[in-house]
C-alpha cells in the first residue's frame, strides 16, 4: 500500500507536524503490470461497495482492424516493442502503447490492462 497524503517533510527538509493521523482513504495500491500467459484476473473491492477487475496474466487480446472496423478476440504470442521501457519487452509486460505480435499481425495496445480487466488493441499495418 502506498500513502498518497501530504508529506511529513518540507521542501527544505524540515519536519512538518500533521494536524491529524493518516486515513485509510489516503492509501493507494501498487501498480500491477500484466504479462503474457494463461488468463488470470484479480477482483479488487473499492470504496463505495464497488469492484475493479485487474489483468495479471492474459494471452488473448481484442484486436480491431481500423480498415474494416471489425473486432476479433485473438491470441498474442510476444511483445515486440514497448515505448514505456525497453526492458519490458524482455519480460513480456503489457502496458498502454505496447506493440504485440498476434495471429492477425502486429497490434498496438490502446487501453491500460492493469486497470481495465481486458486488453484492447488496434491492428498496425
Curated annotation (Swiss-Prot):
Disulfide bridges in this chain: none
Single Gene Ontology BP annotation: translation
One GO CC term, this protein: ribosome
Keyword Protease: no
A single MF term (Gene Ontology): structural constituent of ribosome
Record PROSITE patterns: RIBOSOMAL_S8E
A Pfam family it matches: Ribosomal_S8e
UniProt entry keywords in alphabetical sequence: Ribonucleoprotein, Ribosomal protein
Keyword flag Ribosomal protein: yes
Domain of life: Archaea
Subunit structure: Part of the 30S ribosomal subunit.
Family to which this protein belongs: Belongs to the eukaryotic ribosomal protein eS8 family.
HAMAP family assigned to the protein according to its UniProt record, in alphabetical order: Ribosomal_eS8
Protein name: Small ribosomal subunit protein eS8
Amino acid at each position: 500500500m502506498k500513502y498518497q497524503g501530504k508529506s511529513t517533510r518540507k521542501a527544505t527538509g524540515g519536519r512538518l507536524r500533521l494536524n491529524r493521523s493518516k486515513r485509510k482513504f489516503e492509501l493507494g495500491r501498487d501498480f500491477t503490470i500484466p504479462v503474457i500467459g494463461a488468463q488470470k484476473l484479480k477482483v479488487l473491492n473499492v470504496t463505495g461497495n464497488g469492484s475493479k477487475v485487474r489483468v495479471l496474466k492474459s494471452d488473448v487480446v481484442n484486436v480491431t482492424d481500423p480498415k474494416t472496423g471489425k473486432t476479433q478476440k485473438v491470441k498474442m504470442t510476444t511483445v515486440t516493442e514497448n515505448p514505456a521501457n525497453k526492458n519490458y519487452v524482455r519480460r513480456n509486460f503489457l502496458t498502454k502503447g505496447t506493440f504485440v505480435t498476434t495471429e492477425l499481425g502486429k497490434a498496438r495496445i490502446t487501453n491500460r490492462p492493469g486497470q481495465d480487466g481486458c486488453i484492447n488493441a488496434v491492428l498496425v499495418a
